Amino acid sequence: MSKSALLVLEDGTVFRGVSIGADGISVGEVVFNTSMTGYQEILTDPSYSQQIVTLTYPHIGNTGTTSEDEESSSIHAQGLVIRDLPLIASNFRSEQSLSDYLKSQNIVGIADIDTRKLTRILREKGAQNGCIVAGNNLDEALALAKAKEFPGLKGMDLAKEVTTKEAYQWKQGSWTLEGGLPEAKDDSELPYHVVAYDFGAKRNILRMLVDRGCRLTVVPAETSAEDVLALNPDGVFLSNGPGDPAPCTYAIEATKVFLEKGLPVFGICLGHQILALASGAKTVKMKFGHHGANHPVKDLDRNVVMITSQNHGFAADEATLPDNLRATHVSLFDGSLQGIHRTDKPAFSFQGHPEASPGPHDAAPLFDHFIELIKQHSA
């Protein structure tokens, strides 16, 4: 017999449904994601730390879960909100149902609520703090109090919370449906040594860098520029991650050093915002952010439109770009800045997710541009 659950927003709105995960209470910023597929990749994306994810597509869980689809070693989302959980997970790769997967990692989830209504609230009022309560004792007043107590993501430094504790090597390329996860590549196949800052890095980003010949040393978020330079890298990668970029002063200061040294730098998502801040621009908290796999972005240099995967609640403010930065990409949904390139250094970044997972691969050539900058710098 299914247990009950409720979701309470900080404005007092209450949604009652059924529990699809663990019993308990979970608090975070409630956001919506419009992706039709890729729910496991979304749940395990460290960028969703301290966020409760609402999936707008009505049927979630159809294909079960598999370890090959994880973007990190655990679920980072605070909770999951969906319309309907199918009774059957049909997929020859499936290892566990979505419900069992949530329970195994002690993640709270709720289904059978009006996710269209919830999404309209978040679009009109902006991302809100919320609380999911699941189990036998549902206390609306307690849930509302906890939602109001949550401080919100603005000013919250989460990169240092989700980062790796120790540096490690990554040499595994992309997996295939036929071959599964590949063995680590030999150093002879990886001519470029790249230091990747882990602010909450997704595995598929690392794989796509390896596919292009990068031997990766993944380092903790607070690693000093001095320690990175001692590794003699050919380039530096700034990963995606959760929270507000402004408090990440350790990363901003380190990036300034790499820019001064003229090292090739590539940033994605939070890494994009870090590069912007290190170059003198400012960032802002968005009303409800971009979360989905169908976001159109215009490449200003090539005058083409790309469909991209997005997941961010903060953005670099184009109005604050200094002369050493030029805008390279803009969102066709709201005109927000999506890409920048230094005019004086081999450094650039992209707000969306060129590695997709889930999502389209239109922006994947950005990885190739990073390799081009490394080659030019090494010549």
From Swiss-Prot:
It is an enzyme of class 6 (ligase). It catalyses: hydrogencarbonate + L-glutamine + 2 ATP + H2O = carbamoyl phosphate + L-glutamate + 2 ADP + phosphate + 2 H(+). Pathway: Amino-acid biosynthesis; L-arginine biosynthesis; carbamoyl phosphate from bicarbonate: step 1/1; Pyrimidine metabolism; UMP biosynthesis via de novo pathway; (S)-dihydroorotate from bicarbonate: step 1/3. The active site is at residues 269, 353, 355. Pfam families: CPSase_sm_chain, GATase. InterPro entries: Anth_synth/Amidotransfase (IPR050472), CarbamoylP_synth_ssu (IPR006274), CarbamoylP_synth_ssu_N (IPR002474), CarbP_synth_ssu_N_sf (IPR036480), Class_I_gatase-like (IPR029062), CPSase_GATase1 (IPR035686), GATASE (IPR017926). GO terms for molecular function: ATP binding; carbamoyl-phosphate synthase (glutamine-hydrolyzing) activity; glutaminase activity. It comes from the Bacteria. Residues 193-379 form the Glutamine amidotransferase type-1 domain. Residues 1-189 are annotated as: CPSase. The keyword Transmembrane does not apply. Belongs to the CarA family. HAMAP family: CPSase_S_chain. Composed of two chains; the small (or glutamine) chain promotes the hydrolysis of glutamine to ammonia, which is used by the large (or ammonia) chain to synthesize carbamoyl phosphate. Tetramer of heterodimers (alpha,beta)4. This is Carbamoyl phosphate synthase small chain. It comes from Vibrio vulnificus (strain YJ016).
